[in-house]
């Protein structure tokens, strides 16, 4: 079977949310208990996150509503006060959003014509005359592990560590080199590659963030972003090989990228240690002893459902076909492409929509033959496009803090957790300094252990996972800010975005 053209998926709604930073460096915040809106928060959390709902958009402006994660809207009242709730009329809560050249936004109430502003604490809408106090800096609220897709060239950005360059030439974002960490510091963005180098204003990668790696970001509703140096230079693909570099003359909107959460690509191994791979004519076999491009599958899963779709690098989905064979020829909405997943100590068991479990036949074909699963129906699963994790929970990112010796779960800036595979589904967690994660008798963690411990990872969604710690409990985010492993059951505080 020939490959189909890789179809880029639009960002999910949660990837399109933003935080809005006032001139004072504080975030627009809805106060759930007071029904008020303030701008006192110093970091981006759930209450500082807004979904931009567009009803009409032009090149430099759009008519929008701002919706909180609770489902309520930012509202401007006749007396200039700002609150949140449900709109009473068709224009109540509507703002004219203008995009400014300095990467700022202004929000003008559609009814009164007044601008949304803050004094660094309170938020109100009283002035008709535009000033610097009305400027808001949008910050994308999606997870910091991202990919960049060029809708003009229909390719993804890819870092080349051997040449120290970034190219926009990847048709399928299945490689670790397509993932980047988007750091936000002092109002600017730093783009870090998977090998921990930074994109710069000049034609090479830097080993450390600096003023030469700091970019301003223009943000548009719908996930579109453009990176610039603040002095007229824009970042866009150049030349026949589409080298990502700084220039002043992008053509046809080449400077715009769709910013998305880095997808999850995995490999599956049979009991015999062979990789599940797509072979000639869409056949799927456990035939390869080495990992290759056709052994990679995008893990697509709705967190509300225990079913998963596995999208191969040829653009098709694994699907159960006649004679119970599994083929890589499915399409997104076909019921036969959905498999129910079961977990056993980090190994995955897949059940077809017709009830039978996937296993390896004597001729090495992947088949949906078995009614009662056994070891032959368990597959080892390994991350294929990431050698590290960045975990975000209910209260923020997992990371270290200068004020604590324990690992925290409420940080604005995350730490990388380097993954050292032990066996399928089981990893050692290594801190950024090279030492290992250790666990105390209280179920807390420190980042300077001498010995490697086993952590069991199980996927719960497209970019969601749980971690079973060495003490036998699930790792969870605690409201105090301390990372704990003390949960016998999987609760919402045990679910981690990665």
UniProtKB/Swiss-Prot annotation:
It comes from the Eukaryota. Its main location: cytoplasm. CDD domains: beta-trefoil_FSCN3_rpt1, beta-trefoil_FSCN3_rpt2, beta-trefoil_FSCN3_rpt3, beta-trefoil_FSCN3_rpt4. One of its GO terms (biological process) is actin filament bundle assembly. One of its GO terms (cellular component) is ruffle. Expressed in testis. Acts as an actin bundling protein. Belongs to the fascin family. Keywords: Actin-binding, Cytoplasm, Cytoskeleton. One of its GO terms (molecular function) is protein-macromolecule adaptor activity. This is Fascin-3. InterPro entries: Actin-crosslinking, Fascin, Fascin-like_dom, Fascin_metazoans. It is found in: Cytoplasm, Cytoskeleton.
């Amino acid at each position: 079977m020939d490959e189909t053209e890789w179809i880029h998926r639009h960002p999910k709604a949660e990837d399109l949310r933003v935080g809005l930073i006032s001139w004072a460096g504080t975030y627009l915040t809805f106060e759930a208990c007071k029904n008020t809106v303030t701008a006192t928060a110093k970091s981006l959390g759930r209450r500082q996150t807004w979904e931009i709902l567009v009803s009409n958009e032009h090149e430099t402006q759009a008519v929008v509503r701002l919706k909180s994660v609770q489902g309520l809207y930012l509202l401007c009242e006749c007396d200039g006060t700002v609150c949140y709730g449900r709109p009473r009329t068709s224009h109540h809560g509507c703002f004219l959003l203008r995009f400014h050249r300095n990467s700022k936004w202004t929000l003008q109430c559609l009814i009164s014509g007044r601008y949304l502003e803050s004094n660094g604490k309170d938020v109100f809408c009283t002035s008709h005359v535009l000033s610097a106090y009305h400027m808001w800096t949008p910050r994308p609220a999606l997870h910091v592990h991202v990919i960049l897709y060029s809708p003009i060239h229909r390719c993804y950005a890819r870092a080349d560590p051997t040449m120290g360059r970034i190219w926009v030439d990847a048709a399928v974002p299945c490689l670790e080199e397509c993932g980047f960490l988007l750091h936000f510091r002092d109002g600017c963005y730093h783009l870090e590659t998977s090998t921990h180098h930074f994109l710069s204003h000049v034609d090479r990668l830097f080993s450390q963030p600096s003023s030469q790696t700091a970019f301003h970001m223009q943000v548009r509703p719908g996930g579109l972003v453009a990176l610039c140096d603040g002095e007229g230079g824009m970042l866009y693909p150049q030349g026949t090989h589409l080298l990502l570099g700084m220039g002043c003359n992008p053509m046809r909107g080449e400077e715009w990228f769709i910013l998305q959460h880095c997808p999850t690509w995995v490999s599956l191994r049979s009991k015999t240690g062979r990789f599940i791979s797509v072979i000639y004519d869409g056949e799927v076999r456990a035939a390869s002893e080495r990992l290759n491009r056709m052994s990679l599958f995008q893990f697509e899963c709705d967190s509300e459902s225990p079913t998963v779709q596995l999208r191969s690098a040829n653009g098709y989905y694994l699907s159960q076909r006649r004679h119970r064979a599994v083929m890589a020829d499915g399409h997104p909405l076909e019921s036969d492409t959905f498999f129910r997943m079961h977990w056993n100590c980090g190994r995955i068991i897949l059940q077809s929509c017709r009830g039978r479990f996937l296993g390896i036949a004597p001729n090495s074909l992947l088949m949906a033959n078995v009614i009662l699963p056994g070891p032959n129906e368990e597959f080892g699963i390994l991350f294929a496009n990431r050698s590290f994790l960045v975990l975000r929970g209910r209260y923020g990112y997992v990371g270290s803090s200068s004020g604590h010796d324990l690992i925290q779960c409420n940080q604005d800036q995350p730490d990388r957790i380097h993954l050292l595979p032990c066996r399928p589904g089981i990893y050692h967690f290594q801190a950024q300094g090279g030492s290992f994660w250790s666990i105390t008798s209280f179920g807390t963690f420190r980042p300077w252990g001498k010995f490697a411990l086993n952590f069991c990872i199980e996927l719960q969604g497209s970019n969601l996972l749980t971690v079973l710690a060495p003490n036998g409990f699930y790792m969870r985010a605690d409201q105090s800010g301390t990372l704990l492993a003390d949960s016998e059951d999987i609760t919402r505080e045990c679910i981690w975005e990665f």
